[in-house]
Amino acid sequence: MKISGTGSAHPSKIVTNDMLTQLFDTSDEWITTRTGIKERRVISSEYLVDLAVEAARKALDDAKMNAEDLDFIICSNVVNEYVTPAMSCMIQSAIGAKCPCMDLNGACVGFIYCLDIAEAYYKIGRVKNVLVVSAEEPSGMLNWHDRTCSVLFGDGAGAAVLTPGDNIKATRLSASPACDRLCERRELQYTPFNTKTDVNMPLVMHGQDVFKFATNAAIKDLSALLTTLNISANDIDTFLIHQANLRIIKSIQDYLEQPKEKFPVIIHKYGNTSSASLPMLLDELNREGKLKSGDMLALSAFGAGFVSGACILEW
């Protein structure tokens, strides 16, 4: 398949590092030095599904496609406002599509999971046109008095329309069990039979463990795909790395011995938007005219699980 259109949407509320100093002991310098983040967008009056729908419509417009022509909608999200129905079904209803829908939770790797599934369905002749949407609201998972996590995340949505083609050259998905290193326990409703007392807790993250895993996993995934395709990092025009932490991106860049210009970032203004970060970055590059036909792109992401994934595609 090939990506024929992109879109993104962001909440209107901007939360700067200076604003966070009113909530806990931190500073703009402390946050920027450790993460590269200056501000993030946080949902206030909006609903996440509205951002998802906006991103989807922009992607369809960019692809010059009607929603009725879609064969499949896949949506990645960690936290949906509704337990049911799936967010993909709500997107389908809003845009007027009539195709099957599916949600998945691949943590921050969700967008690459969606690309891989779309490509697999295309190869067996099940679909021609697929809408992929990643919509995330990490702000609702945080303890906003804990600076270790709340400085990192922002909300947003990104989307891509995939159409027939052979532009997705290779993908790789992997998992390494370490579920207690980055997790949030869901709040459950009372039942007369549930004897558990620890039914809810905010997001917990062991930062150093996550940093090591993310860096090593991205390097391993990207190196494996380059070997599979018998190409080198020099053949990649742009590396799109999950916008989790600027130091992680820099570590990957240093290992691959590639120039900074090949690693565009939006983390400084959006923070870590989980699985939405890659399609949001892709859309910004697309709309700014920074991607040329024939460019080779390498996407890499990593997240809770631990899970990781990478994809090399031609623009």
Regions found by a protein language model. Give the residues of each.
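Buried hydrophobic positions in well-ordered alpha/beta secondary-structure cores of metabolic enzymes
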Residues: 3-5, 31, 59, 70-73, ...
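Catalytic phosphate/nucleotide-handling subdomain of diverse soluble enzymes
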Residues: 283-300, 306-315
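Acidic, glycine-rich active-site loops and adjacent beta-strand->loop/helix elements
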Residues: 9, 76-82, 108-110, 134-139, ...
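Flexible, glycine-rich active-site loops centered on histidine and acidic residues
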Residues: 127-157
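Conserved beta-ketoacyl condensing-enzyme motif
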Residues: 3-5, 46-106, 225-249, 253-255
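A contiguous, well-structured pocket-lining segment that forms one wall/lid of small-molecule binding clefts
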Residues: 198-267
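Conserved catalytic cysteine-centered active-site region
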Residues: 32-34, 38-50, 77-130, 254-281
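Condensing-enzyme catalytic core mediating Claisen C-C bond formation in acyl metabolism
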Residues: 1-45, 146-212, 216, 220, ...
